[in-house]
Amino acid sequence: MDIKSLIRNIPDFPKPGIVFRDITTLLGHPEGLRYTIDTLTQKCIELNLRPDYVIGMESRGFLFGVPLAYQLGAGFIPVRKPGKLPAAVHTIEYDLEYGSDKLEIHQDAVADHHRVLIVDDLIATGGTARATADLLAKIGCEVLGFAFIIELKDLGGRQKLPDLPIITLVDY
């Protein structure tokens, strides 16, 4: 199935010159959504990625991370922006092109012996995915790899990530 045809392209959003890759059309297509999750699952199995937890990056990583975790027999844990999680958190600050940002995960969500797979809808510059991996490594988790639906190849995000398996289904 060609899931690229199910992803809507919105020019000049959120600002002029940017083409936004809108996955809501993929999510709304039952066969496309099933194919996407089944394909991610199959690729994880082929690469022998057997996580204890799938880590979903805020917020579209939640949409693909939960069903993937279910398919892999793993738990699901969200990594969120500051102030979104109610209990004690581990935090990492990371640099953006202009400034910095933070990510958080509950302190009791994972431990140093857990094997994790990081999931998001898209990899662009790789900064957020790298920060998520660094946060989990700081806790002591074993990061097994990454899974994304879309890769924006010209932005070079893959090069910022650790030398681990990276699954992508569509590239632009």
Swiss-Prot record:
Function: Catalyzes a salvage reaction resulting in the formation of AMP, that is energically less costly than de novo synthesis.
GO biological process: adenine salvage; AMP salvage; purine ribonucleoside salvage
Oligomer status and interactors: Homodimer.
Tree of life domain: Bacteria
Cellular localization per UniProt: Cytoplasm
Keyword vocabulary terms for this entry: Cytoplasm, Glycosyltransferase, Purine salvage, Transferase
NCBIfam families in UniProt: apt, PRK02304.1-3, PRK02304.1-5
Reaction catalysis annotation: AMP + diphosphate = 5-phospho-alpha-D-ribose 1-diphosphate + adenine
EC number(s) reported in the record: 2.4.2.7
PROSITE patterns assigned: PUR_PYR_PR_TRANSFER
InterPro entries: Ade_phspho_trans, PRibTrfase_dom, PRTase-like, UPRTase/APRTase
Gene3D superfamilies: 3.40.50.2020
Any Gene Ontology CC annotation: cytoplasm
Name the record gives this protein: Adenine phosphoribosyltransferase
Transmembrane parts of this sequence: none
Gene that produces this protein: apt
